[in-house]
Regions:
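Catalytic and substrate-binding regions of cell-wall glycan-acting enzymes that process beta-1,4-linked
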Residues: 34-73, 122-124, 132, 136-137, ...
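Short, functionally critical alpha-helical segments immediately adjacent to catalytic or ligand/cofactor-binding
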Residues: 103-119, 179-186, 276-279
Length: 316
């Protein structure tokens, strides 16, 4: 491996232009301040370029993307490190599903900039979960959202719904950048921006940059933020990040009777109630719904113990 060397970010732009990556965010637009970040970035050019050449989304590193790179390396560095740690919980699962669909794997970082990979994240606009679905959109893509179960907070179910949505948007616009923008702002606003800018149709990633000034303010930062996150997260050690990613949750599922508290399952298994909550963040009242049995996630290899205990005493 070549020895990392420091190069100006402008040089990084030239090196990175042929690379590939992808898009999205739901947090409020943030100030693009870069105070305190030096112009020199540690970046092993040959190694990082080779590593990223196989990705599928076109990577454009321009001034807007550079600002987010500097921000993640500067004042938001600690937060970005936390995101990298939490990626270990769900990143493998999301990548597997992206591969199965033939979608760009870097769409994984949509979840990073949406929620920091937190299934309990909630926005001021009441979006929720790893993928920050609003309630109506979640229901439209098959997720249950009621007073007992909120599948926006289920990383597995919500990932399937989010990828369905992104595939639909990509089919409509022919561009992952525009699909990302539409995920953030809505397809209607992207269509409006296309009309106002006089651009005819989609199908080209460069169109996002052509219509960017006609998009809502938050959406103007959306794709640049994702591209910066993907660039750093794909090769974090090249940018000086030394993190140990969390281990993924390994679980079985077991059908549990109505109104069963998660704490009871925890007692049966002699595990902490917090572990059961972490495995089942979508059970928002800490128990199965009163009107139906429900599939509950339990630590891998423990499902038979739960089944046996509940069979002996289903109403304890």
């Amino acid at each position: 491996m070549s020895t990392p060397r420091t190069i100006p970010i402008r040089r990084l732009v030239l090196v990175a232009l042929p690379l590939t990556i992808g898009s999205v965010v739901t947090a409020a637009a943030l100030t693009e301040s870069n105070r305190g970040v030096q112009d020199e970035l540690p970046f092993p050019v040959a190694d990082a370029t080779e590593a990223l050449m196989d990705t599928r989304l076109p990577m454009e590193v321009n001034d807007r993307v550079e600002r987010w790179v500097r921000r993640f390396l500067g004042r938001d560095r600690v937060t970005f490190e936390e995101y990298l740690v939490r990626e270990g919980l769900y990143g493998g699962m999301i990548r597997d599903r992206l591969r199965q669909r033939g979608m760009p794997e870097q769409l994984l970082y949509l979840a990073m900039i949406e929620s920091g990979f937190s299934p309990t994240a909630t926005s001021p606009m009441a979006a929720s979960g790893v993928w920050q679905f609003m309630g109506p959109t979640a229901r439209a893509y098959g997720l249950t959202v009621d007073s007992w179960v909120d599948e926006r907070r289920d990383p597995v179910r919500a990932t399937d719904a989010a990828l369905d949505y992104l595939q639909e948007l990509h089919g409509e616009f022919g561009s992952w950048y525009l699909a990302a923008a539409a995920y953030n702002a809505g397809a209607g606003r992207v269509k409006q921006a296309l009309r106002r800018s006089g651009v005819d149709g989609g199908g080209d990633e460069q169109i996002y940059w052509q219509i960017i000034e006609h998009l809502p303010r938050e959406t103007r930062s959306y794709v640049p933020k994702l591209l910066a996150a993907a660039l750093l997260a794909e090769e974090p050690e090249h940018f000086g990040f030394e993190v140990e990613r969390s281990l993924p949750y390994l679980f079985d599922q077991v059908l549990v009777p109505p109104s069963t508290p998660l704490r009871r399952v925890a007692e049966i298994l002699e595990v902490s109630p917090s572990l059961m909550t972490e495995l089942n963040p979508h059970l928002i009242r800490g128990q199965t719904p009163p009107d139906r049995s429900f599939m509950v996630r339990v630590p891998m290899g423990t499902s038979q113990a739960v089944v046996a205990a509940l069979a002996r005493n289903p109403r304890r």
